Every structure is written in structure tokens, then in C-alpha cells.
């Protein structure tokens, strides 16, 4: 049984707005600066809930789990988000100590993936604040044809400096 056909989904309208080209020649050395620039452009263009992010973890059996949260802040320590103290997410973060995050600002055709070490930043009775310290960023800019993209990957080297790789599809 097909619940949502490929034809049906393929005919849905795709709304997107070109803000600007992804100028690969002027990328900052620090991916946090590029993230901040993209975030501020999403806010300026009225993107709903630009702070919404999918946070992915794994359970004790290695099965992935993902859910939506809102980031509270981004600073030199990483991305901060709040969660109820007694959730599967907290248990998984405590056990594994790592998380992945994915921001998707669809109307701008931009996505940012982040992977890093997760640690508890604030331990409350009912609320915890967690921090994901990025070790890997991937910025994706989809072209108008939606078949091609520019991607830039930042990874931390052994000296805590960011290396950049540009990929084009």
C-alpha cells in the first residue's frame, strides 16, 4: 500500500527564495561565523523558527533517534539547547556523549549539519541545558535546479584549528 505516492509528492509546490549566491571565495576561517551569517539571513528573511534544529542521538543499541529542539545560544563552547531532565534524549546524551544537529532553512535552500561532543551545561531538577561542541560542520547551498549544490565542510584538526573542504555536486 502506498500512502503518499511519488507523483503526489513530486507535484507539491517548492517554495524557495534566492538570497544570494554562496560566495565560496570569502568564507570565514571559523564556521561559527558562517553559521551566524546564515542564521541572521534566515531571521532577516522571515524564516519561521530559524532556531529550530533536529538533534540526533543514538540509544544503547546503536539505533538513531532524532527530535526537534530550539537552540538557546551559540558561543565559543558550542550550541546550547534545553530539554526536560528525564527524557530518552538526556539518557542517550549521557551514555554516548555525542550528538548531531541539522538546521534546514528551506526557503533559502540552506542546510547546516553539525556533529560534536555533547555535555551537560546546566543540571536542573526539571530542565537541563546541553551543549554540543562542534567538531564537524557541513554547510549546503542548493542551486535553483535543486539537483546541484555547493558544500563546504569544516573539521577540527589535532590543534583545534578549522580545516575547510569545498565540495560541489
Description of each model-found segment:
Residues 1-169:
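Binding-site signature for planar aromatic cofactors or substrates
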Amino acid at each position: 500500500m502506498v500512502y503518499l505516492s511519488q507523483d503526489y509528492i513530486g507535484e507539491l509546490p517548492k517554495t524557495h527564495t534566492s538570497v544570494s549566491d554562496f560566495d565560496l571565495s570569502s568564507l570565514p576561517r571559523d564556521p561559527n561565523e558562517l553559521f551566524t551569517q546564515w542564521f541572521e539571513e534566515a531571521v532577516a528573511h522571515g524564516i519561521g523558527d530559524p532556531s529550530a534544529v533536529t538533534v540526533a542521538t543514538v540509544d544503547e543499541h546503536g539505533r538513531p533517534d532524532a527530535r526537534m529542539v530550539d537552540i538557546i545560544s551559540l558561543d565559543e563552547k558550542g550550541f546550547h539547547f534545553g530539554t526536560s531532565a528525564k527524557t530518552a534524549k538526556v539518557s542517550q546524551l549521557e551514555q554516548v556523549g555525542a550528538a548531531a544537529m541539522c538546521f534546514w532553512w528551506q526557503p533559502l535552500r540552506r542546510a547546516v549539519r553539525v556533529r560534536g561532543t555533547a555535555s551537560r551545561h546546566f543540571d536542573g531538577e526539571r530542565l537541563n541545558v546541553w551543549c554540543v561542541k562542534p567538531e564537524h560542520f557541513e554547510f549546503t547551498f542548493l542551486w535553483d535546479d535543486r539537483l546541484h549544490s555547493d558544500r563546504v565542510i569544516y573539521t577540527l584538526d589535532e590543534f583545534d584549528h578549522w580545516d575547510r573542504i569545498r565540495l560541489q555536486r
